[in-house]
């Protein structure tokens, strides 16, 4: 067997595929992050060692603001290149939909670095509007108001416009026109109105129903004409300045995007022919992230195009339609929040313990007193061969099923059941090893890898930190951040620490394809084993919930300065006290109740005074501690 190399690990976990220019493996066999164009490598194992010194324990979310900056620059650069190539005369506006990640430090970094690119923000609810109008200080930057709206939402947006904010209120439903007209008249404001169009075209992938006829938002063609008539009657003809469309998030196929762009461009042309001087087109979201690194439209976790190709299609389609109809090029808005933010966050979790399926003892050999099923199964194991392995496996399954049935009826004892189980799994391991060497593995053996996988119990909550992995089977690249110069000798599924059977991960990125097991190393005693979960910067933080009352994790901001990394900020994860307060427990009252109970227990002689003090001290300490295992 040839010596394992770092290149083997790169290939095994397809790091060069999904890591783009941001993630890789160094000569020590550790995962690193390269946030900036200056190629400074941040060793993730070194970061975790430093955080351990600072008493910051896993799970911990590492945020790299420099990657956010780089993604903004990359998108802007792609538009600049496309504008030059297609002689585009309009302006491009990158708009960040804060629903993707509303965390204040993330939004603040995007706004701060986005100033020189005139980056705007999008809100889809009243709370988001309150955040956006307060933090978006640049008067030229666009604020797009989407989502359901009531009178107070619209009046707040229009008053902000009156004071100088560049706000577009997008009509999603017919009833919003009356609300906008009434608020505009009341406040004496000429609103910037956008209309969301329900395209017939839809996206591809997990969110394709966000577009097309089944989509939740937008006006159909007949409704659009009715809306325009109503706006004319309200003397708001000249206020209609923007059309908006959205065909879904994480669109996997560029052809779907091209089709939608052509349809939207014709809406733009038709509205100009009707006398509406639309000068903005909001292309919505959809620019995907290649989570598995396959660059394939057949995978819901990948895309078959680049940012540059996406931008080229956006610009070319509207330039072509405009030039053919001799109308101005529209200003183009894109809301590519996933593409901007996914790469900047890495979740680091530690493995607490592992379990494996039983296997037959090396010295085991059946005796005359053993049950006949034990002898039969041992003979199957002893005579296994590639030629007969499928038949052997079928026989082993039959013997195991028979043994379980006999045990349930009290005929087979516990020792016999245990021996048969151990031998059965040993047979499965041998059969799996033989099947893997075959050119064409029998279909019924393809699930053996998953059946035989170890369970690695990790210190995190799937529901809090990776909700999309649970809810929609989203793939995230997961890689050990150390020992990548060693051959991984185990296959595992990952289990979280919630009391929920769904709290597990059994889909992984490996070898340019999805796998039900993750290749990992044997855990060493007294040594931390960390796994990095990558590309988690979009949606995961904000969608996470408190199942089993596991709260937000520790979060750390890391930047590159003077050719080295710096830990800029550490945000403590939620404490037990904080999550109990969320579900309406009063921590102080809980302590008082326990003090009364402990006092009674001491007086009745159930525990000593010292034991009572120790119990209360542990309880108070736990209240102010991390919700995860420390």
Please identify what each model-predicted range represents.
Residues 313, 319-630:
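Charged (often Lys/Glu-rich) extended helix/loop segments that serve as interaction or gating elements
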Residues 58, 62, 84-89, 274-278, ...:
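Flexible, glycine/charged-enriched surface loops at secondary-structure junctions
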Residues 30, 38, 67, 101-103, ...:
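Short, glycine-/Ser/Thr-/acidic-enriched flexible segments
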Residues 87-282, 289-293, 304-309, 317:
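Active-site-proximal beta-alpha core segment in soluble small-molecule metabolic enzymes
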Residues 1-57, 559, 566, 576-579, ...:
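Conserved, well-structured core domains of diverse proteins
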Residues 66-74, 226, 263, 313:
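A non-catalytic, amphipathic alpha-helix used as a structural packing/dimerization or gating element
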Residues 299-314, 363:
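Helical (often loop-to-helix) elements that flank the catalytic cores of nucleotide-handling enzymes
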Residues 25-102:
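Low-complexity, highly charged intrinsically disordered N-terminal segments
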């Amino acid at each position: 067997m040839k010596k394992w190399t770092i290149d083997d690990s790169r290939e095994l976990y397809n790091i060069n595929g999904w890591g783009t220019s941001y993630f890789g493996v160094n000569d020590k066999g550790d995962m690193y992050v390269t946030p900036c164009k200056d190629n400074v490598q941040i060793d993730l194992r070194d970061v975790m060692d430093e955080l351990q010194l600072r008493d910051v324990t896993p799970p911990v979310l590492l945020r790299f603001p420099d990657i956010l900056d780089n993604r903004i620059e990359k998108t802007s650069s792609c538009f600049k290149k496309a504008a030059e190539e297609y002689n585009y005369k309009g302006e491009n506006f990158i708009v960040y939909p804060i629903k993707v990640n509303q965390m204040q430090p993330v939004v603040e970094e995007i706004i701060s670095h986005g100033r020189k690119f005139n980056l705007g923000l999008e809100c889809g609810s009243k709370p988001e509007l309150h955040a956006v109008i307060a933090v978006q200080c640049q008067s030229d930057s666009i604020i797009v108001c989407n989502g359901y709206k009531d009178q107070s939402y619209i009046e707040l947006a229009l008053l902000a416009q009156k004071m100088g904010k560049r706000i577009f209120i997008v009509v999603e439903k017919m009833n919003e026109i009356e609300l906008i007209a009434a608020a505009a008249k009341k406040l004496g404001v000429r609103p910037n109105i956008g209309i969301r169009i329900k395209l017939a075209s839809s996206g591809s992938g997990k969110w394709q129903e966000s577009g097309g006829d089944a989509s939740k938002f937008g006006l159909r063609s007949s409704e659009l004409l009715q809306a325009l008539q109503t706006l004319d009657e309200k003397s708001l003809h000249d206020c209609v300045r923007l059309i908006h469309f959205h065909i879904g998030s994480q669109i996997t196929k560029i052809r779907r995007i091209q089709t939608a762009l052509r349809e939207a461009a014709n809406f733009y042309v038709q509205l100009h022919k009707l006398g509406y001087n639309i000068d903005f087109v909001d292309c919505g979201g959809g620019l995907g992230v290649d989570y598995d690194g396959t660059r394939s439209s057949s995978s819901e976790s990948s895309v078959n195009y680049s940012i540059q190709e996406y931008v080229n299609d956006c610009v070319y389609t509207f330039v072509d339609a405009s030039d053919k109809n001799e109308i101005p090029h529209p200003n183009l808005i894109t809301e590519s929040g996933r593409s901007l933010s996914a790469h900047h966050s890495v979740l680091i979790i530690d493995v607490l313990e592992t379990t494996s399926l039983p296997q037959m003892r090396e010295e085991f050999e059946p005796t005359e007193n053993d049950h006949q099923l034990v002898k039969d199964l041992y003979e199957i194991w002893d005579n296994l061969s590639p030629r007969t392995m499928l038949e052997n496996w079928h026989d082993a399954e039959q013997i195991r099923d028979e043994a379980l049935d006999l045990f349930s009826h009290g005929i087979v004892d516990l020792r016999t059941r245990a021996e048969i189980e151990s031998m059965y799994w040993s047979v499965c391991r041998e059969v799996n090893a033989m099947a893997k060497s075959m050119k064409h593995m029998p279909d019924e053996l393809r699930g053996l890898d998953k059946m035989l996988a170890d369970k690695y119990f990790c210190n995190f909550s799937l529901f809090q930190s990776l909700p999309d992995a649970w809810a929609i089977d989203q793939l995230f690249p997961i890689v050990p951040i150390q020992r990548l110069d060693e051959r991984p000798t185990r296959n595992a599924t990952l289990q979280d620490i919630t009391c929920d059977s769904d709290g597990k991960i059994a889909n992984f990125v490996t070898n340019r394809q999805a796998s039900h097991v993750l290749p990992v190393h044997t855990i060493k005693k007294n040594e931390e084993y960390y796994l990095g979960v990558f590309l988690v910067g979009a949606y995961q933080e904000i969608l996470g919930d408190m199942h089993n009352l596991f709260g937000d994790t520790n979060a750390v901001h890391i930047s590159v300065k003077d050719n080295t990394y710096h830990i800029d900020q550490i945000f403590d994860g939620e404490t037990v006290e904080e999550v109990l307060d969320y579900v309406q427990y009063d921590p102080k009252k809980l302590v008082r109740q326990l003090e009364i109970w402990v006092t009674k227990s001491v007086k009745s002689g159930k525990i000593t005074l010292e034991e009572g003090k120790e119990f209360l001290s542990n309880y108070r300490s736990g209240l102010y501690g991390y919700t995860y295992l420390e």
